[in-house]
Amino acid sequence: MAWIKRKFGERPPPKRLTKEAMRNYLKERGDQTVLILHAKVAQKSYGNEKRFFCPPPCVYLMGSGWKKKKEQMERDGCSEQESQPCAFIGIGNSDQEMQQLNLEGKNYCTAKTLYISDSDKRKHFMLSVKMFYGNSDDIGVFLSKRIKVISKPSKKKQSLKNADLCIASGTKVALFNRLRSQTVSTRYLHVEGGNFHASSQQWGAFFIHLLDDDESEGEEFTVRDGYIHYGQTVKLVCSVTGMALPRLIIRKVDKQTALLDADDPVSQLHKCAFYLKDTERMYLCLSQERIIQFQATPCPKEPNKEMINDGASWTIISTDKAEYTFYEGMGPVLAPVTPVPVVESLQLNGGGDVAMLELTGQNFTPNLRVWFGDVEAETMYRCGESMLCVVPDISAFREGWRWVRQPVQVPVTLVRNDGIIYSTSLTFTYTPEPGPRPHCSAAGAILRANSSQVPPNESNTNSEGSYTNASTNSTSVTSSTATVVS
């Protein structure tokens, strides 16, 4: 019997993922996902003031893997407190202390007291979320998307020259209402239990779609590209539930009036009102937690204005989301799971004897391998944003097949050399060919992203594996429309 001698404190070698472990993962999908939701811009604080980020950044722990991990740790002798995930959040600089997030008993937490001072000269920054378990086992450090620092909302008539402050059709926004500028009275548009409501605790991210003025009301509607301007017809669709409000016309707010003739681009942190189209001056309004219709009053001396109440004035801001998914395929690991690689696109190169797939994304490292289903592919690391791999032959999935007879779709995942599986939500499809071409190892790739967003212009492959792009300016979107109480 051979004994393996190790020095004291030396870590055991990492376990490589087995084919069987990958099959179990693909069957059960017990992922652990960290979501960081935040605004795309943050207002700077001057002197001793603290302008807390609004809406507050929010961290969600999603996926069945968190519960399974907790149960596994408790089976291995950990107490309930030791198996509890802990998190701290900060703005990525050493001057400001990180703030603890309270995740006990729930899967989300908001960071309500983050701010950036004028002594911090950065024009952009990223939130940093440090996570570990109660027994001090490290989970890792997760970064948000990039946040732009602004001094204050632009009062000037906005132009498209400042495109990064404008709001494009099809992007996500949050809407909040603050009575008499009091922070404690802030309420956010949110969907819960199939209803729109004004929440003081959670905020929703809504797709804002630009519609043609003559688009009729319906669950299906055609959206337009371009930046949102005041006076245009828009549709707000919850990015989580798909629920939508009726057609709205977005109007600029000046003091307590809605301007009927404003047509400049909508900008970050502007106050705006939403007129319910084809109604008698009805506006989207909150009354405590309820979302209602409020009837505006015409201004007798100014026909281009309508008087609204405070509850119908909403502040608009673009939002973003960083999403990190991982799974311990060979059991617990000693190293943090971060940096979590994120794959943004796939591109098929070549054909014939060897087809190569190029992966573009972020946080790639040399210790990653690409897997097609339960088949590990030969992988070449290029840099932190690019990897190449050899597409496995179809016979690896369909024994005896020398060419593709019907479409075969396999998930694409990245696997670290210690067995950590990083799901990509992308798939590779072997597509049929008109006749036998035994030397072609891959007929084509089709990228599918499992998201609730409006699909981007998709790439399609023909039988030779080359790409044809189908692009269109309009996209059909299906939603379920909610009625607003009058």
Curated annotation (Swiss-Prot):
- Domain IPT/TIG per the UniProt entry, residue ranges: 341-431
Where are the stretches annotated DNA-binding? 43-53, 151-156, 178-183
Q: What biological process terms from GO does the record include?
A: positive regulation of transcription by RNA polymerase II; positive regulation of transcription of Notch receptor target
Q: Which InterPro entries match?
A: Beta-trefoil_DNA-bd_dom (IPR015350), BTD_sf (IPR036358), CLS_fam (IPR040159), Ig-like_fold (IPR013783), Ig_E-set (IPR014756), p53-like_TF_DNA-bd_sf (IPR008967), RBP-J/Cbf11/Cbf12_DNA-bd (IPR015351), RBP-J/Cbf11_DNA-bd_sf (IPR037095)
Annotated region described as Disordered, given as residue ranges: 451-486
Keywords associated with the record: Acetylation, Activator, Cytoplasm, DNA-binding, Notch signaling pathway, Nucleus, Repeat, Repressor, Transcription, Transcription regulation
User: Keyword Calcium: yes or no?
Assistant: no
Point out residues bearing the modification N6-acetyllysine: K161
Q: How does it assemble?
A: Interacts with activated NOTCH1, NOTCH2 or NOTCH3. Interacts with MINT/SHARP. This interaction may mediate the recruitment of large corepressor complexes containing proteins such as HDAC1, HDAC2, NCOR2, SAP30, FHL1/KYOT2 and CIR1. Interacts with EP300, MAML1 and PTF1A. Interacts with RITA1, leading to nuclear export, prevent the interaction between RBPJ and NICD product and subsequent down-regulation of the Notch signaling pathway. Interacts with SNW1. Interacts with CHCHD2 and CXXC5. Interacts with BEND6 (via BEN domain). Interacts with NKAPL. Interacts with ZMIZ1. Interacts with RBM15.
Role played: Transcriptional regulator that plays a central role in Notch signaling, a signaling pathway involved in cell-cell communication that regulates a broad spectrum of cell-fate determinations. Acts as a transcriptional repressor when it is not associated with Notch proteins. When associated with some NICD product of Notch proteins (Notch intracellular domain), it acts as a transcriptional activator that activates transcription of Notch target genes.
Please identify the protein, giving its name as recorded. Answer: Recombining binding protein suppressor of hairless
The species this protein was found in: Pongo abelii (Sumatran orangutan)
Lineage, please? Eukaryota, Metazoa, Chordata, Craniata, Vertebrata
